[in-house]
């Protein structure tokens, strides 16, 4: 199930149409060039890079690739970068240990847009194999209206297929799916695609997004996922005007915890997720949480070993400090990231937000003094909840977040213990708005002229700096880019 034993070779390239160099070219060549130019004009007319850029970027041009595949329905729109990006691609990402606005590019793995791939696919028997034409028709020819989102590495489209087959069906019927494409301009996207199919294709759990199938046809690589109609947790917490109700937040926290617990303690081969964050938690129609995007997932260390040494990857603000400092990855790194997300759900604040006052940019550092102080914990609560939260539940969440965010990874709880702690919280009815304490506290703050602003976050502004930036328009899966930090000596990827 790992990425190490691999054996399918092919050249992976994407070429833009070339202009005619000689007016006396044969008629056949002239017709070919004319056809390519018509495709370009059609793409520009669409008002979106879907037609032209999609055909040249999202969907690779024909080449000699035999076996490979593409796309991730998760934090990015096509395949995300794992160790590097193609040399000609710009990035807004940054290493996990640094916060800067400088643009960084890494080509540690690939310095060409036509890398030679040599990897092994471990495709599960339950996955459906689609033809490219099936997916083209299911998404209505990849038209802009079907576009769920786009990112630096490709696009995600909404499609409809047979309930138990691969044939396309009329929109609104059959099974709704998300079809993700792979931009072939770099080895890293392919590596993350391999991780996605090798992990998510072999892991089945109610709290993991289901991989329905794949397409490997010439140099076309696409992946097909179950459609998640409510999009990402990030979208609901930070991009919508109506606040997410407390009980729903707790339901989502519990579901996400169950997903991590399965990966760490129940999977046949334990897995470290390595990229747990709000944008990778997708929601179905009933707000059931499912983890998406396994592009950075790693096999847990073998028995007798304490950690995996690897290049630091992920999103700034979520990565555990010991992992950032040493590159030593353990399941407790995921537990720390869970604590950050729990804090985001509690406060309504992003893990990193430079639009906030000095001292409040980093959510964890700002929140630490309040986490274990019963007199100050109320300052953490999302003001948009307006007292519609369980007092006991909020106290339990702050305690749990403090444990998960411990600087000593050995003190952090196992995810199975987190699940047990969260189970009762969605059903608690002791709303703060009806308590004398909360009403008195609110009155005192108003009297002091602090209103909601003291310790409470307003609506968040720009997204935090990341090595993989994210967005989730139209309920689609989020997108991200990432930038690796220097690789530790002897580390693997």
Curated annotation (Swiss-Prot):
Its EC number is 2.7.11.1. It comes from the Eukaryota. Its main location: membrane. Residues 450-475 have a biased composition (Polar residues). Residues 12-37 have a biased composition (Basic and acidic residues). A lipid is attached at residue 2 (N-myristoyl glycine). Interacts with the Xanthomonas campestris effector XopAC/AvrAC. Interacts with SD129. This is Serine/threonine-protein kinase PBL34. It comes from Arabidopsis thaliana (Mouse-ear cress).
């Amino acid at each position: 199930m790992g990425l190490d034993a691999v054996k399918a070779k092919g050249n992976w390239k994407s070429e833009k149409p070339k202009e005619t160099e000689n007016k006396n070219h044969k008629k056949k060549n002239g017709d070919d060039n004319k056809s390519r130019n018509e495709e370009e004009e059609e793409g520009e007319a669409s008002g979106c890079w879907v037609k032209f850029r999609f055909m040249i970027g999202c969907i690779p041009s024909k080449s000699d690739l035999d076996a490979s595949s593409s796309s991730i329905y998760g934090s990015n729109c096509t395949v995300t970068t794992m160790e590097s990006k193609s040399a000609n691609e710009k990035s807004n990402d940054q290493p996990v240990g640094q916060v800067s606005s400088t643009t960084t590019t890494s080509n540690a793995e690939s310095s060409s847009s036509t890398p030679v791939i040599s990897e092994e696919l471990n495709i599960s028997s339950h996955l459906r194999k689609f033809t490219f034409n099936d997916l083209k028709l299911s998404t209505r020819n990849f038209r802009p209206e079907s576009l769920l989102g786009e990112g630096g590495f490709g696009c995600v489209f909404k499609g409809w297929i047979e309930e138990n087959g691969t044939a396309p069906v009329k929109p609104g019927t059959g099974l709704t799916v998300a079809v993700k494409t792979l931009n072939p301009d770099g080895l890293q996207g392919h590596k993350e695609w391999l991780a996605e199919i090798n992990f998510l294709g072999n892991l089945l759990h109610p709290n993991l997004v289901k991989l329905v199938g794949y397409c490997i046809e010439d140099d076309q690589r696409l992946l097909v996922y179950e459609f998640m109609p409510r999009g990402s947790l990030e979208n609901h917490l930070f991009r919508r005007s109506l606040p997410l109700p407390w009980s729903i937040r707790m339901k989502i926290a519990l579901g996400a915890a169950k997903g991590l617990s399965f990966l760490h303690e129940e999977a046949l081969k334990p897995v470290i997720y390595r990229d747990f964050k709000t944008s990778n938690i997708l929601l179905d129609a009933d707000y059931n949480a499912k983890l998406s995007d396994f592009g950075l997932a790693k096999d847990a260390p073998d028995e007798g070993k304490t950690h995996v040494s690897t290049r630091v990857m992920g999103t700034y603000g979520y990565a555990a400090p010991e992992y950032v400092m040493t590159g030593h990855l353990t399941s407790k790194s995921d537990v720390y990231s869970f604590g950050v997300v729990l804090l985001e759900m509690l406060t309504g604040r992003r893990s990193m937000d430079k639009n906030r006052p000095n001292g409040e940019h980093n959510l964890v550092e700002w929140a630490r003094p309040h986490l274990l102080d019963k007199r100050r914990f109320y300052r953490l609560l999302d003001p948009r909840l307006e007292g519609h939260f369980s007092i006991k539940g909020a106290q339990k969440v702050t305690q749990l977040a403090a444990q998960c965010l411990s600087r000593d990874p050995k003190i952090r709880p196992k995810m199975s213990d987190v699940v047990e702690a969260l189970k009762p919280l969605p059903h608690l009815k002791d709303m703060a708005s009806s308590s004398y304490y909360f009403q008195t506290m609110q009155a005192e703050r108003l009297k002091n002229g602090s209103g909601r602003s003291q310790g409470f976050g307003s609506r968040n502004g720009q997204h935090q700096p990341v090595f993989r930036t994210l967005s989730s328009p139209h309920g689609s899966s989020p997108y991200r880019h990432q930038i690796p930090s220097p690789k530790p000596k002897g580390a693997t990827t």
